[in-house]
UniProtKB/Swiss-Prot annotation:
Its EC number is 2.1.2.9. SUPFAM superfamilies: FMT C-terminal domain-like (SSF50486), Formyltransferase (SSF53328). GO terms for molecular function: methionyl-tRNA formyltransferase activity. This is Methionyl-tRNA formyltransferase. It is an enzyme of class 2 (transferase). The keyword Protein biosynthesis applies. The lineage of its organism: Bacteria, Bacillati, Bacillota, Clostridia, Eubacteriales. (6S)-5,6,7,8-tetrahydrofolate binds at residues 109-112.
Length: 309
């Protein structure tokens, strides 16, 4: 079948590759090249890099809704499907109406929960035990279209958003192929999104600042949910201390939240509003992420210091 693919980051690449293997991808739309690195050289998106390997035409509208030339090109292609995976732009009704069988979006959550830009992060920050991918028929709303297929994965207690990203990135391609086949042969019936929802808004760096009055479980979830970006942090003796790995000790302690009560090679124990957080991996300014065992081999972390002050 004739496909137009719209996607931008590395999350979209495995799905794109699956579509190339099984279908005829006639064109790719991706975000414009952006300055990257110290030299601020323009860098291609991961999807553009993959498209060029296969000599697939690439279009990079700043705003697709205003780009009449590209919209006319899409109409000329007359695709059976437009497939959207983390494209980064809203599609207008004019574009949604172009493909014969509709525009399908792969969204990295179990809709209707975690609509929005950062589902992989918020599902972990909120302490959920499962997540997954959903394919849906796109409409003019934000992640509000009728659902097609879902695939669940379990979230274990130490999983980071980066690890969840990598799992769903790989599994999404197969789900898209099943969705295309099912819509084509009529075996999939779209289902309206109903019930509880939570909007997974874009992350900001303010969210990453740890509040030690919170329950240790909530802080642990924040640390997992903000890894690999932007990384949860606190202050130790006025220096920013980023937390990469933690675990929770079910223990009530009367010290002020944020107080370091024990330091050994296994971690730094910190009092929280409820329970105790054990910090296992940190990064200080101008340093690399290190386990506590590695860090205290050449530096000190003092007991009784109150973090965040």
């Amino acid at each position: 079948m004739k496909i137009v693919f719209m996607g931008t980051p590395d999350f979209a690449v495995p799905s794109f590759k699956k579509l190339i293997e099984e279908h005829e991808v006639k064109a790719v739309l991706t975000q414009p090249d952006k300055p990257k690195g110290r030299g601020k050289k323009l860098a291609y998106s991961p999807v553009k890099e993959e498209a060029l390997k296969h000599d697939i035409p690439v279009y990079q509208p700043t705003k697709l809704k205003d780009d009449k030339e590209i919209i006319e090109k899409l109409k000329e292609i007359n695709p059976d499907f437009i497939i959207v995976v983390a494209f980064g732009q809203i599609l207008t009704k004019e574009v949604l109406d172009i493909p014969k069988y509709g525009c399908i979006n792969l969204h990295a959550s179990l809709l209707p929960m975690y609509r929005g830009a950062a589902p992989l992060n918020w599902v972990i920050i909120k302490g959920e035990k499962k997540s997954g991918n959903t394919t849906m028929l796109m409409d003019v709303g934000l992640d509000t279209g009728d659902m097609l297929l879902k695939e669940e994965v379990e979230i274990h207690e130490d999983m980071t958003s980066g690890e969840l990203h990598d799992i769903l990135m790989i599994s999404g391609g197969e789900l898209l192929l099943k969705t295309i086949e099912g819509l084509y042969n009529g075996s999939i019936k779209p289902i309206k999104q109903e019930g509880e929802t939570f909007y997974a808004k874009m992350l900001d760096k303010e969210l990453a600042h740890i509040n030690w009055n919170d329950d240790a479980y909530d802080i642990h979830n924040l640390v997992r949910g903000l890894n690999p970006w932007p990384i949860a942090y606190t202050e130790y003796k006025g220096e920013r201390m980023k937390l990469y790995k933690t675990k929770v000790l079910d223990k009530e302690v009367s010290n002020k939240p944020g107080t370091i009560i024990e330091v050994n090679k296994d971690g730094v124990k910190v009092v929280c509003g409820k329970n105790v957080l054990i910090i296992e991996k940190v990064q200080f300014p101008n340093g690399k992420p290190l386990t506590i065992e590695q860090y205290i081999n050449g530096h000190s972390i003092d007991k009784d210091i109150i973090l965040g002050e």
